[in-house]
């Protein structure tokens, strides 16, 4: 008999405000521990230097984390001009120092180059893999390997300010965009070099900035619960966002209660749908009049709703530590 996973069955998404100096995995494990969750996963790592929004999916919410990985992101970044580092951020070694000598017009022209659809060559100091190894492992050994450029889109690049040798920008971009690489490339275009000294992710998909919560706040709530002799879940669970918020932009297909059991067994079912839906388009599946979210699916060539990823409804609690 398979052993039940430790932790409770709790489903949802925590908008963590990650602090600087910690890895995304460390932050993830802390959140999982605070909520006593049986499963947890984050939706796109932030560098230790970076702070800000790190959605953490709990329980069945982990099934939809890929859709947040694919979502647009927004960052506030401050770059130090005049110095280039080997990692393109302040965690690296300075490899070149140059004078800062450009006009406002040259800066604005350079910024415009990065707007819209472009190709970006990822930094050697990234988690992308080459022959099974992360690029940063090669970089640490002084080995440079070939990297293919990748298409990215910068939807917005807003100039926030320039104070002395520090330039601050607001960047709204597509998945897979390396802000460090943009700053390094910008520094080279300006002829002075640059590297990231502050990076904060302010948005993932349409999640509100105001709903973020830090590890310190979570820890304080757990301590408060212990003082009040109540279960920490009483104070923590209201912070969770519904897991279907990860796919809120998918069109909804509602399945009548009468045929819901067939769908939940993995069968494709015929339901009334919007004529505008395309074959193989991902949809958000809800059940009955209460429109309970149960997963995602696609409309197949026969006009049937085919489940792709369904949540598991647990009737029994998981084991606790």
Curated annotation (Swiss-Prot):
Its EC number is 5.4.99.25. Keywords: Isomerase, tRNA processing. It holds the Pfam family TruB_N. One of its GO terms (biological process) is tRNA pseudouridine synthesis. One of its GO terms (molecular function) is tRNA pseudouridine(55) synthase activity. It comes from the Bacteria. InterPro entries: PsdUridine_synth_cat_dom_sf, PsdUridine_synth_N, PUA-like_sf, PUA_sf, tRNA_psdUridine_synth_TruB, tRNA_sdUridine_synth_fam1_C, TruB_C. Coiled coil: none annotated. The active site is at residue 47. It catalyses: uridine(55) in tRNA = pseudouridine(55) in tRNA. The keyword Secreted does not apply. Belongs to the pseudouridine synthase TruB family. Type 1 subfamily. HAMAP family: TruB_bact. Responsible for synthesis of pseudouridine from uracil-55 in the psi GC loop of transfer RNAs. This is tRNA pseudouridine synthase B. It comes from Shewanella baltica (strain OS185). The gene is truB.
